[in-house]
C-alpha cells in the first residue's frame, strides 16, 4: 500500500517536529554547557541525536512506502531558561506534546487503514512512554 497524501503530509509534519526537537535539545545543551553543567549538556546532546534518529526513521519508512518526504523549515527554539529545573520542566512538557503528535499520527494511520504504518508507529508510541518517564524521573530529583 502506497502512502496516501494525508499520511505523507502527516509524516512530513512529524519529521519537522522531530527536527525542531533536536534543535531544542541542542539549545538546552548549550545552556548547560555555558553553566558548566557538563553532565546535563551531554544528556541533552544525546537527546538531540535521538530526535534526529527519529526523523530519519520516519523519512526512511515514508520513502519506502512511496511517500514524498521532505525537510521543511523549522522555527527558532528557545535559548534561555530561568534555572536548570526549568529546562527539565520544559523537557517533560515537550515530550508530552510529542506524545500527542505521535498519537495524532497514529490516528491518521488508523483512519487511512494503513496497518503497516500503524505497526511502524507502535515503536514511537512506546518510545514516548519511555521519554516521558525519563524526564519525570529527572524532575523528581530536583
Tell me the role of every PLM-derived stretch.
Residues 1-142:
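Iron-associated oxidoreductase/ferritin-like identity signal
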Amino acid at each position: 500500500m502506497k502512502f496516501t497524501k494525508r499520511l505523507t503530509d502527516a509524516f512530513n509534519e512529524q519529521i519537522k517536529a522531530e527536527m525542531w526537537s533536536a534543535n531544542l535539545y541542542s539549545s538546552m545543551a548549550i545552556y548547560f554547557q555555558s553553566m558548566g553543567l557538563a553532565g546535563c549538556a551531554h544528556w541533552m546532546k544525546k537527546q538531540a541525536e535521538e530526535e534526529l534518529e527519529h526523523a530519519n526513521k520516519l523519512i526512511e519508512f515514508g520513502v519506502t512506502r512511496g511517500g514524498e518526504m521532505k525537510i521543511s523549515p523549522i522555527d527558532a527554539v528557545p535559548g534561555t531558561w530561568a534555572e536548570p529545573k526549568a529546562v527539565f520542566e520544559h523537557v517533560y512538557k515537550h515530550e508530552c506534546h510529542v506524545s500527542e503528535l505521535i498519537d495524532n499520527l497514529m490516528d491518521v494511520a488508523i483512519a487511512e487503514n494503513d496497518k503497516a504504518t500503524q505497526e511502524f508507529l507502535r515503536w514511537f508510541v512506546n518510545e514516548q512512554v519511555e521519554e516521558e518517564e525519563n524526564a519525570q524521573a529527572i524532575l523528581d530529583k530536583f
